Amino acid sequence: MGSLFLAASQGELDTVKNLISSEKIDVNATDEGGATALHWAALNQQIPICKFLLEHGADVNAIGGDLQAAPIHWAAKRGSVKTVHYLVQHGADPLLKDKQGFNCLHLAVHAASPLLVVYLLHLDISVDLRDDQQHTPLMWASYHGNEPITNCLLRWGADVLATDEDKMTPLHWSIVGGNLKCMKLILKEGGIPCTAVTANLSGQLKTPWALASELRVSHLFKQALISNGLKVKETSEEPEKWVVVPSKFQFSQKTFIIFCFLSSFIITGVFFFIMSICPMVISLIIAPLWIYFTFKYITTCIHANIDIVHFYLETPFLAGIFSSIFFWVWCHSLLYIVPKTLPIKPLSSLLFVLISFTCIGLYVRTAFQNPGYVDKIGAVVQRREEISKLLDKDLFNQSHYCLKCFQVKPPRSYHCGACKRCINRYDHHCPWTGNCVGARNHRTFLLFVFTLSTLIPIYFYVAFYYLQNIPIQKKYESYRCLFISGTICQWSLKDMFVLVASLTLFVNWCWVVVLAFTQICQVAHNVTTAEFRLFKRYGTLVPPTKQNSSPKNGHGIHGSFLRTVCGILGLDQCILLIRESNCFVRCFPSRAELGSQNSTSLSRNLSTVNPYDEGSIIKNCKTFWKQNFLNDGRQDEATRHV
C-alpha cells in the first residue's frame, strides 16, 4: 500500500492507475498517519494524480495526518494556488479547520504566499477569520513580517483593531515580529487609537510602546509613529507613563508635496541671485552651501513627517528643480534678452519664444496627462473570473497579476511604486515631470524631449548676441575678473545671470540629448525602457514570476552616489544601449559576464526575444506614432510567445 502514497507524491500516474484500477487498494486508503493518496498528491502539486483520484471517488475533504487536515490544507501549506484552485473546483471546503484551528487562509499566510491569499479572499472568505486562539490572518502576517500579505489583507479591509485571547492587536504582533514596514502599514490604517490599546500578557497590561520597549524595537516603532503623524507622550495615567498621541502639527502628504515642489523655485531663485549679484569668490562658496543646507532641510522635513521610501521618485522635488530653472531663465529671457535681440535677430528671437511656449505646453501635458492607468475592476465576481482565467492558462503569477491593485496586468504593463498604479505600456517613471511615461503620454514626452533639446541651443544663440550688444553695467566698469579674462570676463560684467544660466542649461542639455538618443533607439526597436532593462538582466522582455512591479533600480536610486546621479539623468540607460552596440541589437558581454555561466546576455540578440519588433526600424516607428497601445489585440498574441 505504501507504493500508492509514494507514487502519488512523486507524480507516477501510471503506477497510481494500476493500483487503483486493479481494485487492490481503496482510493481512500490511508497510510500510518491517516493521510490519503490525495493528501500526498495535493502536497506535491501533482494535479494529474489529483484528477485521477477524484474521478475514482476520492474524498476531497478527507481528514488525515497528524494535524487532522484535509488535502486542501496540505496544498495551502505549500502555497500552491493551482492545486488549491483545482480542489475547490471539485468541492473542497476552504473553511475547514485543522487540529491547530487553521483554515486555508491562515495556512496561506504561514506559507508566505500572497497569490494564494488573494485567491482565497476572492472566494468570499472573511478576511478576519480567527483560529482557535482568536488570531486573525492579519495578526499572523504582521507577526511574520510579511509586508505583501499584510498590505493585501489591509487593502481587503482587515480589522486593524481586532484582538486575540490576550487582547493583542495586529500592531502588537507587528512589534513582536519587529518589522517596520508592517508597523507603518497598520498605523496608516488606524491601527492605534489616541488612547493606546493594552494587551494582557501574563496578567500585565502592555501598550504597544511598552511592548516595543521591552522587545528593544522602540526605535523602529518610533519611526513608524512619526511617519504616520503620531508621537509618544509622557503622562501619569495607568498602566504606564507613556502613551501614543497625534503630533501637535500634522500636515497631509499633499501639503508636503506642494511644499516640496514650490520650495524648488526658492532654492533655484536664490541660487541664481547669489551667482549673479555676489562676487565670484563669495558666490562659489555661498551658493553650494545654500543648496546643500536647504536640500538637507527639505529632505529631513519630508522624511520626518510622511512615509517616503524613494525621495526623488515619490516627491516632485526634481520636477520642481527643472520647472524652476526653466521658469527663471524663461522670465529673464522675455524681460531682458528678447527685447534686445528682437531688432537684431528677429527670426531667432521669435523662434525662441514660439518653441519655449510649445515646450511649456508639452511639459505640462506630459506631467499631468494620464500615462495610461490600467482600469480597475471593482466587482469581486469579475476579479474572481479573471483569476480563474489566469489559473486555467497557468498564468496566475506576479508577472500577470498585480497584488497591489488586485487586477490582471495587461501585456507590457507594470506597477509603478511612485504612482501606486499599474501603467499600460510602462516605459519609466520620470522624476523630472513627476509622472510616469506610459501608453497615453509617451509620444507627448518624446515630443517634449525633442523640443527641449532644440530650444536650449537656440537660447545659447540669442544669448550670445544679447551679450555681444549690451554694454558693461556701470557699477562693474571698474571691476576686474579674478579667475577669467577676455570675452568671458566682459560678459560676466554685462550680465552674470546669462552666463550662469547658460552653464546650467548646458549641463541639462547634455543629458536631455542623451535621453533623446536613448528614446529614439528604443522606439526604433519597439522596446520600452523597462523592457530593455529586463532584457539586460534576464535575457527576456517579460519579468520573472516573482517580479510584480517596475524593474528595480529603474532610476539607479539604490547604490553609490554616482549610480544615483546616472540613474536620475538617464545616463545609465544610454551606457547600456551603447554597450549593446551593433545598432543596439547584438549584446557584447563584459568581462564579468564572460566568466559567468549563468549570464543571459551571452550571444543574445534582442530581436530574437522581442515579440513586438515589426521587422524594420521604419515599421517600428510607424507603430509607435500611429498605434493605439491601449486597444492593441496583437500584444496579447505577442505575450504568448515571450
Curated annotation (Swiss-Prot):
Residues at the active site: C430 (s-palmitoyl cysteine intermediate)
Protein's cellular compartments: Early endosome membrane; Golgi apparatus membrane
InterPro entries for the chain: Ankyrin_rpt, Ankyrin_rpt-contain_sf, Palmitoyltrfase_DHHC
Membrane disposition: Multi-pass membrane protein
Top-level taxon: Eukaryota
EC number: 2.3.1.225
GO cellular-component term (any): Golgi membrane
Topology Cytoplasmic: residue spans: 1-256, 299-316, 365-444, 518-642
Record keywords: Acyltransferase, ANK repeat, Endosome, Golgi apparatus, Lipoprotein, Membrane, Palmitate, Repeat, Transferase, Transmembrane, Transmembrane helix
GO molecular function, one term: protein-cysteine S-palmitoyltransferase activity
Catalyzed chemical reaction(s): L-cysteinyl-[protein] + hexadecanoyl-CoA = S-hexadecanoyl-L-cysteinyl-[protein] + CoA
GO BP annotation list: protein targeting to membrane
Functional summary from the UniProt entry: Palmitoyltransferase specific for casein kinase 1.
Domain notes: The DHHC domain is required for palmitoyltransferase activity.
The protein, known as: Palmitoyltransferase akr1
Species: Schizosaccharomyces pombe (strain 972 / ATCC 24843) (Fission yeast)
